[in-house]
Amino acid sequence: MLVIALATTLCANVFINGVAFLIPTLHAERGLDLAEAGLVSALPSFGMVVTLIAWGYLVDRFGERIVLAVGSALTAAAAFAAASVDSLVAVGIFLFLGGMAAASSNSASGRLVVGWFPPHQRGLVMGIRQTAQPLGVGLGALVIPQLAQSSGVSAALLFPAIACAAAAVVSAVGVVDPPRPPRAEARPEDLVNPYRGSSTLWRIHAVSVLLVVPQCVVWTFTLVWLMTDRGWSAASAGAMVTFAQILGAAGRIAAGRWSDKVGSRLHPVRTIAIGAAVAMGLLAVTDLIHSPLSIAVMVVASVVTVSDNGLAFTAIAELAGPFWSGRALGTQNTSQLLTAGIVPPVFGALITMASFPLAFAVCALFPLIALPLVPVAADPLRNQPPTT
C-alpha cells in the first residue's frame, strides 16, 4: 500500500508541478511573457485549493480506493484534454480542472498509509510517502522540458496524462481500503467533529502554516540567490537545487523514523522549528557578511525546513481518526497551499526593496512564533512507548 500511495501521489505531482517546466516553451513558442506563463503553470495548484477539503470528505465517506482511482482517472482525462486543444484558454481551463482532480491523492494516500501501518511505523512510512512531491518534481524536470522542446506543449502534457492514467489503473486494482468499522457500529466519540471543543488540530494547522514560510522562501529563491547573490552559473545553481531537494526528501524520511523511535510526533516538530529558526538566522548572518559558508547553511536550511511536513500530516491523521482524517488532511493541505501562494510575491518584494539577508532574517521569526503553538501535550503518541 505504501508503494501505491507513493506512486499515485508522485504521478499527481508530475501533473501539478510539471506544468512549470513548460514555461520556457510557452514563452518562446506561444509568445507568453513570464508572468503569463507563470500563471498558466500555477493553474493546477489553484485547482487543488478549491477541492482538497471536498476530496477529504469523499475519502471519509467512501474510502481510499474509489477516491484514488477516480481522482487519478479524472486528472488523466484533464491532461489528455489539455494536450488535445490549441487554445491557451482551453488549456488553462483543463489544467485548472486537472488540479481539482489531482487533489484527491493528497488526503487519500495519506489516510491509506496511516490506516495500514501501526503507530510505531507511521512516521517512517509517511516520511517516505512525503517524498512524492520532490520525486514528482524531479521526474517532471527530467522528461517534460525535453518533450516540450522537441515536440511541443501538447506532447509534453501527454506524459503526466499517461502517468496519471496508469496510477488510476493501479489504484483500482491494487488498493485495499484499511479496515475501519462501519459508521453505524463506530463509537460515538469517533464520529464527533474533532475540531469542536479542542484547539489541537487548529494549532497544528497554524504551526504548519508558519513553518511552511521558510520552506517556501528557500525553495523559491535558492536558485536566483545562488545566481545573483553568489555569482553561480545557471547550470551549477540548478544542480545545487536538485541536490538540496534530494537531501530534503531524505530529511523527511529521517524525521519520520525519529518520531517513531522517540514515540512522539510533536516534540520533533518543535525541535525542527528551533532548527529552522537557527538555520534561517545563520543564513541571514553569513549572507550579510558574504561568507562562503552561506551556501552550506542554505543546503542545511533546505533540509530542516521541510522535515516537519510528514510529522504534522501523520499527527493530524492520528488525532482526527478514521471518520474525520480526510477532511482534516484536506484542511492541512489547503492552508499550506494558500500560504505557499502568498509567500513568493511577498518575500520577492521584500528582497527587491531590501535584501536577501533581511528576508532570511524575517523568515527566522516564523518558526519562533510557531514554537509556543505546538500542542505537545496532545501528542497522538503520548500513550505509545518508544520503539527500540
Model-derived segments and their meaning:
Residues 19-20, 200-242, 249:
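Extracytoplasmic gate region of multi-pass secondary transporters
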Residues 50-86:
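Conserved MFS/SLC helix-loop-helix module at the cytosolic interface between two early adjacent transmembrane helices
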Residues 51-63, 252-264, 351:
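Helix-to-loop junctions at the C-terminal end of transmembrane segments
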Residues 61-71, 261-274:
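Cytoplasmic membrane-interface "Motif A"-like loop-to-helix N-cap segments
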Residues 94-133:
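Cytoplasmic helix-loop-helix junction between adjacent transmembrane helices
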Residues 129-175:
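Helix-loop-helix hairpin linking two adjacent transmembrane segments in secondary transporters
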Residues 177-205:
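Juxtamembrane intracellular "pre-TM" segments in multi-pass secondary transporters
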Residues 266-312:
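C-terminal transmembrane helical hairpin of 12-TM major facilitator-type secondary transporters
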